[in-house]
Amino acid sequence: MSLNSRFVDLALCACLAVCFPRTFCACDASDDTDFPKSVALAKKTNRPLLLAFLGTDWSISSLKLDREVFDQAAFADDSKYNYLLCKLHFYQTQERSPEIVRQNEDLAERYHIEQFPTVVVLSPDGGELGRLGYIPGGVDKFAAAVNTLLAKSRSSSP
């Protein structure tokens, strides 16, 4: 294989990794959809949990939130220390296991989800602290909104 073709292969891989970061993520992408595991980890690590109710294959705002915020390395770095993310997908065109579909529908009913996307912010013990939707401006704006919500909940708790 020539040096030129190796360079082309490397450049193609780099482009794919940038365009589709979850595909090239070293972590198991399915982990962030496991609600019981996410709740247990939030308690264990004493971090808030973001429950993201998403319809990424039919809701433009859900798709934007997922691509502009959740799929960005900067969000992963911030959330690694400050909070956890659990994505709950409501696909219309993709198949999901019946267990995941049931879990997500039950959670949408429990939290009275009426629009997508909705991000329910939970305390480490499971209490609801607030809600967010899509916020234009990428990771910085979204993380600032989450941090503001968390600061308000801390200042109002006894």
What are these regions (language model features)?
Residues 11-22:
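Bacterial N-terminal signal peptides
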Residues 24-40:
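N-terminal "domain-start" segment that seeds a small globular fold
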Residues 31-32, 72-102:
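Thiol-based oxidoreductase modules, predominantly thioredoxin-like and allied folds used
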Residues 37-71, 75:
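Local sequence-structure signature of Cys/Sec-based thiol-disulfide redox active-site neighborhoods
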Residues 45-50, 81-86, 114-117, 124-127:
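Loop/turn elements at helix/coil->beta-strand transitions in domains of secreted/extracellular proteins
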Residues 68-69, 106, 110, 114-155:
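Non-catalytic, surface beta->alpha helical segment in thiol-disulfide oxidoreductase systems
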